[in-house]
Amino acid sequence: MRLSLLLLLPLLGAWAIPGGFGDEASLTATAPELDDEEKFSTHIPTHLRCDACRAVAYQMWQHLTKAEAKLLPLDSGGRRELSESVYTDVLDQSCSQTWQGYGVGEVDQVKRLMGPGLSTGAQPSIMVMIMEGLWPTRLSKTCFHYLGEFGEDQIYEAHQQGRGTLEALLCGGPRGACSEKAPDTRTEL
C-alpha cells in the first residue's frame, strides 16, 4: 500500500515523505485544497510571500556560494570573491532557473510553500505537496522583483556576510515579506 501511494502521488503532481517503513500503523495524507488565488493567480498569495522570499534568498545564496567555490584565488581576507559581471550573471541564472522541487503543502492545517531551503520544523511522517501549476513562474517573478528592488551589488554584499544576512535583506525589515505587518500590495476592486 505504501509503495503504491509513493508511485501514485507523483502522477497526481504531488509527492510524499514516508515515515519508517517498518511501522505497522497506517498512514494517510490528503493534498491541500488550493483556493482560486493559489491555483490561478500570477502572483504569490499573501500568506505564502514569506516562504517565497526565503526560497528566493536560499536559491540566490546557493548559486552564489557554488560560483565562489569554483574560484581558485582567495582575496586577502581568505574569501573567494566574484567579479561584478560574474555575480550579476549568477543572480540572473538563479532567478531564471526552473524552480523544481517547490510546491504547497499543509503543516498543522496551515498551507506553506515547501522545497529546498525551507524548513517548517518537525515534519509529519507523511505529507502531500502540490508541485504543479504556476509556482515556478511565480518564484521566478518574485526573484527578479527582489533583484530589481535591491540590485545585484547590495544582494552580493549581503551574501558575503552570510545566508541569514541575505535573507534579512530580502525578507526582513518593517515592510519585508516576513515582517509581522507585511504590506498587502493588492487592492480590492
Curated annotation (Swiss-Prot):
Which biological process terms from the Gene Ontology are attached to this UniProt entry? integrin activation; positive regulation of cell population proliferation; positive regulation of immunoglobulin production; regulation of B cell proliferation; regulation of cell population proliferation; regulation of insulin receptor signaling pathway
Signal peptide from the UniProt entry? 1-16
Where is this protein chiefly located? endoplasmic reticulum
- Output a single Gene Ontology CC term carried by this record: endoplasmic reticulum chaperone complex
Prevents secretion from ER (motif): residue ranges: 186-189
- Cite the InterPro entries for this sequence: DUF3456, MZB1
SS bond partners: 50-178, 53-171, 95-143
Q: Looking at the record's lineage, which domain of life comes first? A: Eukaryota
The subcellular location is: Endoplasmic reticulum lumen; Secreted
| This protein's UniProt keywords | Disulfide bond, Endoplasmic reticulum, Secreted, Signal
Post-translational changes noted in the entry: Forms an interchain disulfide bond with IgM monomers.
Q: How does it assemble?
A: Part of the ER chaperone complex, a multi-protein complex in the endoplasmic reticulum containing a large number of molecular chaperones which associates with unassembled incompletely folded immunoglobulin heavy chains. Interacts with HSP90B1 and PDIA3 in a calcium-dependent manner.
**UniProt family annotation:** Belongs to the MZB1 family.
What does the protein in this record do? Associates with immunoglobulin M (IgM) heavy and light chains and promotes IgM assembly and secretion. May exert its effect by acting as a molecular chaperone or as an oxidoreductase as it displays a low level of oxidoreductase activity. Helps to diversify peripheral B-cell functions by regulating Ca(2+) stores, antibody secretion, and integrin activation.
Protein's name in the database? Marginal zone B- and B1-cell-specific protein
Q: Which organism is it from?
A: Bos taurus (Bovine)
Q: What's the gene? A: MZB1
